[in-house]
Regions:
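Acidic/polar, glycine-enriched structural segments that form the non-catalytic walls/loops
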Residues: 2-295
């Protein structure tokens, strides 16, 4: 009689955890839940955004799309505006397909191909005092995506200041991201967490950072630790709820938030959704727990 052998699922899965010990711009890791995905650099956030050009660091969802108007006077084109390629099938029936661009119809073809496009919902990054952080500022890196938990663990130093970050996505029906940062530099206000909201674009980054006047970021509710935002991009909109445990949120500029810690630890969560009620935030620890249960 063959003895029963129970598979240790956690041990089996954990043997495949990806680990990074250096900055690899061609191998960013992602957390998500099938509806929302957050791609991170070695800091567990999107701090080195400018250095990840081939594989952009984005926050994308199944529901987050944007349509860029044709012009200020005209919102969209339709297939009726497109010059089709015509074929006659075996039965003699005339068929029309949008096969290629026709001379004089290029703008219509390109617009229909590019719209709607996925939207980068938010960029989450670390900032050193009033300066951006570059790869040269970061040393001593180790990052591991624990597949069984769905949590990304990152350890590194910024200008010789040790940092530990946990990154996760709610995995039980909510589109919420969570970040937990520990560093002595937080208490000294040297490091802060910054959230940036871009306009949409049809390229691989899904972001246009040059069109500040073409979208709106409106504060609907605010306190030291919580903020509810209404994001409007032309005819598209979504909501973002931010919860900063152990910190204070302040708006800097039209589409940027900055979060400072009260001590050496800062937990933030970001709830995203098409409806206002979907942007109701849970704590970062609740999101981490949901990620572990969902694994």
């Amino acid at each position: 009689m063959v003895a029963e052998h129970k598979i240790d699922r956690q041990k089996l899965i954990s043997g495949h955890n990806p680990v990074l010990t250096e900055i690899a711009t061609d191998s960013p890791l992602t957390v998500g839940n099938g509806e929302l995905a957050f791609t991170a650099d070695i800091t567990g956030m999107q701090t080195l955004y400018e250095e990840y050009q081939e594989l952009p660091l984005c926050t994308m969802s199944q529901w987050g799309w944007h349509t860029k108007p044709v012009s200020r006077e005209k919102y969209n084109y339709t297939l009726d505006d497109l010059v089709m390629t015509e074929y006659v099938n075996r039965e003699g029936r005339l068929l029309k397909y949008p096969q290629d661009k026709k001379v004089g119809n290029e703008d219509v073809y390109n617009w229909l191909r590019e719209n709607p496009h996925r939207l980068n919902l938010v960029r989450v990054r670390l900032q050193w005092e009033e300066e951006s952080i570059s790869a040269e500022d970061i040393t001593g890196v180790r990052q591991e995506l624990v597949l069984y938990e769905g949590i990304l663990y990152s350890e590194f130093q910024i200008r010789n200041n040790a940092c530990r970050v946990r990154t996760a996505c709610h995995n039980e029906g909510r589109d919420i991201l969570a970040f937990s940062l520990e560093s002595e530099a937080l208490k000294e206000k040297k490091i802060s967490i910054v959230l940036d909201f871009p306009y949409g674009a049809s390229d691989i980054t899904a972001s246009d950072w040059t069109q500040n006047d073409r979208h709106r970021t409106t504060i609907l509710q605010t306190s030291d630790e919580k903020m509810l935002l209404w994001r409007q991009l032309d005819r598209d909109e979504y909501y973002a709820g931010i919860y900063a445990q152990g910190g204070k949120i302040r708006k800097e500029g039209s589409h940027t938030l900055r979060i400072f810690a009260n001590g050496e630890k800062l937990d933030i969560s970001i709830a995203l959704g098409k409806q206002k009620e979907q942007a109701e935030c849970l704590s970062a620890q609740e999101v981490m727990n949901a990620s572990k249960r969902g694994g």
